[in-house]
Amino acid sequence: MTVYFIGAGPGAADLITVRAQRIIAASPVCLYAGSLVPQELLAECPEGARVIDTARLSLDEIVALLIEADAAGQDVARLHSGDPSIFSAVAEQVRRLESAGVAYQVVPGVPAFTAAAASLGRELTVPGVSQSIVLTRVSTLSTAMPEGEDLRSLGRSGATMVVHLGAHRIDQIAEELIEDYGRDCPAAVVAFASRPDEIVLRGTLATIADQVKAAGVTKTAVVIVGRVLAAEGFPDSYLYSATRERTTH
């Protein structure tokens, strides 16, 4: 049997992938990460399925449930918000399943930062402006940043900066990025991306902290900083060049 780590997307239930929806509908056991997972998705679970909210469970308790289901010959749909490859806390579960000899698969989902970019109506890689994206977070008591991965160090690249799990540290984020990006650099914060209660804030590094505080945003938000957010007059991609040799593949 198999444990499926499923990316449930950023918030809107209809952003789930077709593959994920199919697996959920066929799994007799479904574990989901509390309010971070769209509740509508739970309706996809088959009748009689064991549906468990893991928000208050420890890692040991969660893994025990996964191993128990495997021993009973049951597939498990393990739902995480966003995409399992980014700040999902899936690695710890995978490590233990491998030690226990339990088969697993990872099913990708729509990450929060792409949903945030969609809400802003902006591409995060624009020709001549930025062709790189830094996905990061700020240091917390629970998770310290490795040496060299602080915002000041990462900001020296000038790349489009995407900060997860950092709305409550918006003052720190702005302060550490202003030196390399400038006070007038466009900045945006999208909370609850793709959900009905989504909040979109646009400003600059000089103003965004006050905007975030005024809106009462403290969690479930993505901070995006970079010139791409207001880019104009950039060159067209060579993809559209009339001189480019085109093929059918």
Curated annotation (Swiss-Prot):
Pathway where this protein functions: Cofactor biosynthesis; adenosylcobalamin biosynthesis; cob(II)yrinate a,c-diamide from precorrin-2 (aerobic route): step 4/10
Keywords in alphabetical order: Cobalamin biosynthesis, Methyltransferase, S-adenosyl-L-methionine, Transferase
Top-level EC class as recorded in UniProt: transferase
Reaction catalysed by this enzyme: precorrin-4 + S-adenosyl-L-methionine = precorrin-5 + S-adenosyl-L-homocysteine
GO molecular function, one term: precorrin-4 C11-methyltransferase activity
InterPro entries: 4pyrrol_Mease, 4pyrrol_Methylase_sf, 4pyrrole_Mease_sub1, 4pyrrole_Mease_sub2, Cbl_synth_CobM/CibF, Siro_Cobalamin_biosynth, Uropor_MeTrfase_CS
Enzyme Commission designation: 2.1.1.133
CDD domains assigned: Precorrin-4_C11-MT
Keyword Calcium: no
One biological process term in Gene Ontology: methylation
Pfam family, one: TP_methylase
Organism domain of life: Bacteria
Similarity-based family: Belongs to the precorrin methyltransferase family.
NCBIfam families xrefs: cobM_cbiF (TIGR01465)
Protein name: Precorrin-4 C(11)-methyltransferase
Species assigned in the record: Rhodococcus erythropolis (Arthrobacter picolinophilus)
Gene that produces this protein: cobM
